[in-house]
Amino acid sequence: MLTNHMQFEFPAPIMQNAYFKDSTTILVRLEDASVYQSSNEGFTWNRLFPDETILAFYHHPFTSDRAYLITNTGKFFYTTDTGRSWNHQNAPNPPNTFGAQVLHFSPENSDWIIWTGDEGCGGGANNCHAEAHFSRDNGRKWTLLESYVRNCAWARDKSLLVDPSQILCESYRDKSGSQRFFQMGSNPLQLIGGSNFYTNKFKIFDDVVGFTKFSEYLIVAEVKKIMFVCDCVS
């Protein structure tokens, strides 16, 4: 029995790697912000967009032939055919530097995406904050959702069968100053819901730690203020 053995040495340590589902195509991101693609399970490799600084990539969790390469500017690259071809679009701002997930995807429509980026963060800006936009055409046109956010995502999930147009945002109550200096308790993080693509907004919680989706449940961690009253006689 004959086996083929090929060795490829990447020029920097691997930071991220993932296959396209049910495919022989794999993406690898290196420490030097380069991305390589193999379409034959690693037998041969090709560097993608060598002139770009690529900070991360995302596979679409609901559409297995789609992936997105996030650069350090407002440009991102995407494929809709398992990496056979790549195109680019422009996001409304650079990817956020607050640790939030840059892209969120909808199970309802492959073209519905949410982008969370930096706004006003150049130099020593006093109003640096995260800003979320959504697109219904895979990034060709963007609409502002909310400023001063920590996270915005589609409410619907595979098992959480709510209004597919509803969006949830963790949004700071006071929208001024640099978000980098917000401390827990000083500026409440509200959970805001919005149906009809966030046009009909409503506050769900006044002060939250965060939310997550698990199966058919939406789980929210709320901040509870505890008051101690002492009726003491000295």
Question: Each PLM stretch: what is its role?
Answer:
Residues M1-S234:
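Extracellular glycan-interacting surfaces
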